[in-house]
Design a protein with these regions (language model features):
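Active-site histidine-anchored catalytic micro-motif
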Residues: 1-150
Length: 150
């Protein structure tokens, strides 16, 4: 079975655990679910949904791959070669200035695989499934959930 989760991101962390669990219960079998992001700057991550832990992750990302601003306060990522649009070939007209987002994606996965027992996700007590938005929010994103029977 394959299901698509469509979301419009409004923050860095979007908890998708309940939606994946709902699909898993509907499926009702044992096996695995692969949760896959179709996007290069939107990742899938399993971790604890604790506010200070998420603040630590945000702080780490801002240190490792900051999003630069010019003196007028506008975002200007000229620190990243990816953002030198004039030097790149085949760049779409709506290309984002998001070199920092691509560097941040190095720390996450594009997918996670979770075991299922009779329709129930097998997650640890505190473990949640997140979509991680590495670009500025307000993006339409698709997550593919593929259920594989035992």
């Amino acid at each position: 079975m394959k299901k698509i989760i469509e979301i419009k991101t409004d923050k860095l962390f979007t908890d998708i655990t309940e939606k994946v669990s709902e699909y898993s219960k509907t499926w009702g079998k044992s096996g695995l679910v692969n949760i896959y992001s179709k996007h290069t700057t939107f990742c899938i991550w399993c971790s604890e949904n604790e506010i200070l832990h998420k603040a630590d992750v945000r702080f780490f990302l801002d240190k490792v791959a900051p999003r630069y601003k010019n003196p007028e306060g506008e975002h200007n990522n000229i620190k990243y070669l990816h953002d030198l649009i004039s030097l790149r070939n085949d760049v779409p007209s709506n290309e984002r200035i998001n070199g920092h987002s691509h560097i941040r994606s190095l720390f996450f996965n594009s997918s996670e695989t979770i075991p299922i027992d009779k329709g129930m996700l097998i997650l640890g007590e505190w473990k949640k499934i997140f979509g991680i938005e590495l670009d500025p929010p307000d993006r339409d994103r698709e997550i593919v959930c593929t259920f594989i029977e035992e």
